[in-house]
Amino acid sequence: MNRETTCCFTGHRPEKLPWREDEGDPRCLELKARLAGAVEAAYEKGMRHFLCGMARGADFYCCEAALALRERRPGVTVEAVIPCEEQAARWRERDRERWFSLVERCDNETML
């Protein structure tokens, strides 16, 4: 991993966000659009490897933005940074399914 071209993400869980679980809320949609713009700007500045925390909420949004960037731009890799093997074990089924889908789509995963 080259630190000069690596960008890391982590953020708030849904409980700390004003819209909580409602990803259709205009504020959430605005945040996701801004994240997509920030990821694109990072790419323009030379970032190619994106490390994503894999918690619910903003971590998921960032991972999804990085994966979308990878579809549009060459040379992008996305790595899931997982704090422990059982991270998603106690989550609701839909959150676990989203987590597994994101991890599967990432190029690499690192267990801390």
What are these regions (language model features)?
Residues 1-112:
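Acidic/glycine-enriched connector segments
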